Amino acid sequence: MKNFRRIGILTSGGDAPGMNAVVRAAARAALARGVEVYGIYEGYKGLIHDNMKLFSSPADLCNIITRSGTILYSDRCLEFKTPEGMAKAIATCEKNHIDGIIACGGDGTFRGATDLSNHGIPTIGIPGTIDNDITSTDYTVGFDTAMNTVVQMVDRLRDTCESHARCDVVEVMGRWAGHIALRTGIACGASAVAISEIPFDAVSYTHLT
């Protein structure tokens, strides 16, 4: 088994609630075991451009657990998908003697983590996306907060709808995954829910008006 002495942590893709908690927990666990931890800024872009900061003690992670977004910032990096970009990322790891990477993000982040692993850099992926579209896990980091936020907004919107005796259509995020729409639709008592996984015809909803 490889002896990890120094690791890097990054957040990539769209930000999700709870990413700071992930960074804090992973970094503190590593520091408690005598492993040096680098926070890599702007996802894989920071890995390519050697943009990182050493977390020398748990004190560097104080008061971030309740903050939204990610203190490491996040970005989508097309260069990382190229052979040249991957070579730069590997060179950064070798230069800084980084033994492994922890990457928090969605499906694109996981593809990047797989590529890093295939190039000899041990990488762990932590599912962090409001879309909840990562396999082999019931809930991704950020999904629960996204659902609760939508429910709160719909509860407020319902008052206006009832005041004007009308029906409103609410569009939520999720890209090609309908988890937010389905779960919040059930929680809010929606008359109907349309998700991308199930083909639907807008005409079939006219009876609701």
Residue ranges of predicted features:
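Short glycine-rich or small-residue beta-strand-to-loop segments that form or flank ligand, phosphate
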Residues: 6-14, 71-75, 100-103, 168-171
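Short Gly/Thr/Asp-enriched flexible loops that form oxyanion-binding sites at enzyme active sites
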Residues: 22-26, 108-121, 181
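N-terminal phosphate-binding or glycine-rich loops at protein starts, especially the Walker A/P-loop
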Residues: 2-48
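Glycine-rich oxoanion-binding loops at beta->alpha junctions
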Residues: 47-101, 141-153
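Conserved small/polar residues in nucleotide/adenosyl-binding loops
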Residues: 206-209
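Short, acidic/small-residue loops that bind anionic groups at enzyme active sites
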Residues: 41, 117-140, 144-149, 194-201
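Conserved anion/nucleotide-ligand pocket segment
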Residues: 164-199
